[in-house]
């Protein structure tokens, strides 16, 4: 566990604990996305779809979820899902409760935690962001990522940058 001054902690979710925390993680995602990119499905339909996808993804040793809590898992306030593959670090999903967004330096502290835990051979950073999510696109731009294409269904942009640019951002500025 790593803390910052606001008692925010980061911990890796053990793959066998996904069932225990899945609804809490999804609730944060759903509450954030309902206004940005609603699916038109019920909350339960979206949960089942998300859960099935995440369970499948978490079978890989290269995929991880970092849980963000406000101290000893008293309250989960967010999560970060990522994967690594040879020289690429893919930021798959970051969700922070609205009431904590932009506070306590969570975002930058999270990246400090991540940078300590990913392999040195990483050279590139990638992410996908919904085309309508201008906030995410702006943040990814500050991290040194640029649009290089779209996902298969055209809903999201595919972005890429260098690991070096991410480290430079972490050492210099806040988002």
Where are these regions (language model features)?
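Conserved GNAT acetyl-CoA-binding A-motif
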Residues: 118-129
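Short acidic/glycine-enriched loop/turn segments that link adjacent beta-strands
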Residues: 87, 133, 153-156
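Conserved N-terminal entry element of GNAT/NAT acetyltransferase domains
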Residues: 1-27, 165-175
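Acetyl-CoA-dependent GNAT
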Residues: 12-16, 23-92, 97-99, 111
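Conserved beta-strand-loop-alpha-helix junction that forms the acyl-donor binding cleft
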Residues: 127-137
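Conserved acetyl-CoA-binding loop-helix of GNAT-fold acetyltransferases
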Residues: 96, 102-116, 138-142
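Short loop/turn motifs at secondary-structure junctions
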Residues: 90, 121-123, 144
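Conserved catalytic-core motifs of GNAT/GCN5-like acyltransferases
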Residues: 128, 144-162
């Amino acid at each position: 566990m790593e803390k910052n001054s606001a008692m925010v902690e980061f911990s890796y979710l053990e793959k066998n604990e996904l069932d225990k925390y899945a609804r809490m993680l999804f609730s944060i995602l759903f509450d954030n996305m309902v206004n940005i990119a609603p699916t038109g499905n019920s909350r339960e339909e979206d949960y089942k779809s998300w859960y099935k996808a995440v369970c499948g993804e978490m079978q890989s040793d290269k995929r991880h979820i970092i849980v963000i809590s406000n101290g000893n898992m008293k309250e989960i306030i967010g999560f970060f899902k990522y994967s690594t593959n040879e020289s690429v670090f893919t930021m798959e999903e970051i969700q922070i409760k609205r009431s904590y967004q932009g506070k306590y330096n969570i975002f930058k502290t999270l990246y400090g935690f991540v940078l300590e835990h990913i392999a040195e051979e990483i050279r590139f950073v990638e992410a996908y962001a919904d085309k309508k999510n201008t906030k995410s696109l702006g943040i990814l731009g500050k991290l040194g990522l640029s649009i290089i294409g779209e996902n298969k269904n055209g809903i999201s942009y595919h972005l890429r940058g260098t690991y070096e640019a991410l480290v430079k951002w972490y050492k210099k500025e806040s988002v």
